[in-house]
């Protein structure tokens, strides 16, 4: 055990020296075919180590439990640190001086995991060379772990993660990486329609500084389809009328005869809102938003008016109460949003589908995620932002994980049979 501990301590020390002298490891050095060559060299080296195990003590030591336990303990400890320390995105520098916030590029972490991977590979070769059906579960488990570790690390260099900004009606085939470099892709996406489902509007009371009341735990009224009246901050609130898609009557009158191309260019400012008359009317035009007619009472005081969160076409409107307070509608929160798209591929596919948040679509090795949209335009957004991810080594990682699970189940079953005997 002392030798294994000494090796791990040496790897940690060497890793720290490399970290401070060379900086974090750049996995881009292992882009294909470098990662494939590295994997082949590693396997050949492990085979040579096994053949020379009787001549070189170190090679035979690699297959012992005295080598495995310190390596597993160090890897587990570093993984725990990785889970506790907040990790920064791959394109950002480490947030701390040592580099614990970018653990996947942290030399001590990499060297310890590399050492553990070598031990797993060497034990797999040893078990395979002494093959028996009784050992099949443990061979399968070790082989799966070796495949998962090597392919997940070496394959990370080939993973592509790109953002694509698609405007309605225009096919787009270019994506941006984390450094804003443009990449032309073998697939194109055309946005046909963006849809969004929103949570019911929320009303709250704010002070003259714009802070919700009460300060520590603001009160909120959820105005769903069944809400008629309620109380907030000492005021009794009654909903007289609710229009889910509304625009100021004055704005609707101004643009009704305009061409559609010009309607989106007209915006009602705060001055126009102050001068407006006629309240709000139901409208299907782009830029409409929820508007609620409110009667607020407190003792003998009564306030009536409209409340809306506004949109890119017109600003929000509040209901003035007393002592500088106002009743406001918070910005609507999205419950679900998705894009109806056409996906074109170089091999002639034309796929019509819907891409929803957390429900990616997979085509030709690419996973397409709904990432964002034009939040200023909200549900009327004419732009969808997609994230496209391609990981050519992912299937190999899955194979390793499945083998690991199969081996674990096999060991559990064989252990049960031994107990019965």
Which residues fall in each region the model found?
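Solvent-exposed, non-transmembrane regions of integral membrane proteins
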Residues: 1-421
